C-alpha cells in the first residue's frame, strides 16, 4: 500500500511537471510569436516608409526633369523672340527714318517758336540764378545750424554721461557703506545673542539656587516644630537670624536678576537703535533732506525702556518678597503675614490702579505725539512684563519687516533707474531721428536744385547748339558713326559677357548660399538680414548721389558761364548787324536761320537716331537682365 501511494504521488508530480512544462512551452511559443509579429510589423512599417521615400524621390526627379525640359523650351522661345525683336528693330529703324523726314518740316516751324521761347527762358534763367544763390545761402545757413546743433547735442551727451558716471560711483560707495554697516550690525546681533545665552544660563543657575533654598527651608521647618513651647524667646531669635540670612541671599538673587534683566533690556534697546539706524539710512538714500525726522522716535525708544525697567523691578520685588516669607515662618507668623498682606492689598491695588491710569495717560500722549511708536514692541505698555523670548521674537519680526521694506525700496530704486535709462535712450533715438530727417531734407533740397540746374543746362545746351556753326557738323557725324560702331561691338561683347556672367553668378550664388547657411548656424549677420538690405541699398544710393552732386554742380556752373561767352562771341562776330538798318537785319537773320535749319536737319536726324539706338539698346539690356534674373531664380529653385 505504501509503494502504491508513493507511485501515485510520483505520477501526479510527474504529471504536474509535465503540465507545467507544456504550459511554459505554450507561453514561450506565444511570446516568440508575439515578438516575431511585432518585428514583422516594424519591418513592414520601415519597408513602407522606404517605399514612400523612394516614390517621393522618383516623383521629385520627374519634376526636376520636366522643369529642365520646360526651361530649355523657354530658352529656345526667348532666343526666337530675341531674333524677332532684332528684325522688328530694323523695321522700326526704317519707319523712324521716314518719320524723321516728316518731322523735319515740323522742326523748322518749331524753330521759329523756339527763338521766342529762348528769350523768355533767358529771363527765367536769370531769376533762377537769383533763386539758386538764395538757396545756396540758405543751405549754408542750414549746414551751420546743423553743425551747431550736433555740437550742442554732443556736449549735452557728454555732460549726461559724466553725471551718470558720478551718480553710478556715488551709488557704489553708498552700497559699499551699507554693506559694511550690515556686517557691523550682524556682529552686534551675534554679540547680543551670545549675551542672551549667557543670561539664560545664569537664570537657570538662579532657578537651581531657588530650588535649593526652598529645600533648605522645607528641611528647617520640622526642626522648628520640635522646639519646646517654654523656650519661645530663644527660637524666635534664631529664625529671625536665619530669615535675615535668607533674605540677604534672596536680595542678592534679585539684584542679579535685575542686572540680567537690565542686560536683556539694553540688548533690546540696542537692537531697536540698530533698526532705527537702518531706517535712517534707507530714508537718507531716498530723501536726503529729511535727516531730522527719526530723532523723536529714537528718543521715545530710549526713554520708554527706563520706565519699563522701573516697573518691572517693582513687580519683581513685590513677588519675591511674597515668595520669601511664606515657607520659613510658623503657622502663627503666616497668619500674621496674611493679615498684614490683606491690610496692604487694598493700598497696593490703589497704587497699581494709579500707576495704570498714569501709564494710560502717557500712552495717549505718546500716540498723539508720535505715530511711529505703535510699531515698536517696547513702546506698548503692559500690566505684565514680556519675557526675553517674546521680545526676541518681536525684534525678529521687526527685522523681517525692515528687510522687506529695504527690498521694496531697492526694487523701486531699480525701477526708477531703468525708467531713467529708457527715457535717456528714447531721447537719444529721437535726436538721432531728427538728425536723419534734417539730412534727408537737405539731400532732397539738393536733389531739387540739381534737377533745376540740369533743366537749365539742357536749355542752355539748346542755345549753345543754335550758336554753334557748321564747323561742328562733320565732327558730330564722325562721332555718330564711331558711336554706332562702338554700340554694335559693345552689344556683341555684352552678349558674350552676359553668358559668362550668368555662369559666374550661379557659382557665386551657390557659394553664397553655403556661406549664408553656415553663418546662420552660427549667428545672423545684420548685413545679411533681408529687412536691412533695402535700407543699405538706399544709403549706398544716397552716398553715390552725394558724391556725384559736386561734379554735376561744377559742370552746370561751367555751362551757365559758357552761354554768356558764346552770346558775346555771336554778337561780336556780326558787325554788319549793328550798321545795317532794321529791315536788312531781319532779312539777314531769316536767311541765316534758313541756312542753319537746312544744315541742322541731318544733324537732328543723326541725334534722333542716336537717341533711339540708345533707348533700344537700353531696352535690350533690361530685357536681357530680366531674362537672366528669371533664369537665376529658376536655377535657384532647382
From Swiss-Prot:
Similarity remark? Belongs to the GOLIM4 family.
Record protein name field? Golgi integral membrane protein 4
Q: Which residues form a coiled coil?
A: 66-216
Q: Give residue spans on the Lumenal membrane side.
A: 34-638
Region (Golgi targeting) residue ranges read 38-107, 176-220
Ranges for the region named Endosome targeting are: 80-175
Locations of Acidic residues compositional bias? 348-361, 534-553, 577-593, 616-626
Q: Where are the transmembrane segments?
A: 13-33
Q: Does the keyword Cell inner membrane apply?
A: no
Q: Which residues lie on this side of the membrane: Cytoplasmic?
A: 1-12
What are the boundaries of the region Disordered? 217-245, 280-415, 455-638
Q: Name one GO cellular component term.
A: endosome membrane
Report the function annotation for this chain.
Answer: May play a role in endosome to Golgi protein trafficking.
Q: Tell me where it mainly resides.
A: Golgi
Organism, by scientific name, is Xenopus tropicalis (Western clawed frog)
- KW Coiled coil (keyword) present: yes
Q: How does it sit in the membrane?
A: Single-pass type II membrane protein
Cite the entry's keywords alphabetically: Coiled coil, Endosome, Golgi apparatus, Membrane, Signal-anchor, Transmembrane, Transmembrane helix, Transport
Q: Lineage of this protein's species?
A: Eukaryota, Metazoa, Chordata, Craniata, Vertebrata
InterPro entries, A to Z: GOLIM4
Biased region (Basic and acidic residues) positions are 301-316, 323-332, 402-414, 455-467, 510-521, 594-615
Q: Where in the cell is it found?
A: Golgi apparatus, Golgi stack membrane; Endosome membrane
